[in-house]
Amino acid sequence: GLYCCQPKPNGQMMCNRWCEINSRCCGRR
């Protein structure tokens, strides 16, 4: 399935494009 936020190896979170378009993710608007 699709997850809004996924952890990168460096510990930061990355946001899927679907989430960025359709929802809020990782504090982005």
UniProtKB/Swiss-Prot annotation:
Keyword tRNA processing on entry: no
Cysteine amide PTM sites in chain numbering: C26
GO cellular component: extracellular region
Keyword Phosphoprotein: no
Tissues where the protein occurs: Expressed by the venom duct.
Localization: Secreted
Cystine bridges: C4-C19, C5-C25, C15-C26
Source superkingdom: Eukaryota
Domain notes: The cysteine framework is III (CC-C-C-CC).
Family, per entry: Belongs to the conotoxin M superfamily.
Protein name: Conotoxin Bu17
Lineage of producing organism: Eukaryota, Metazoa, Spiralia, Lophotrochozoa, Mollusca
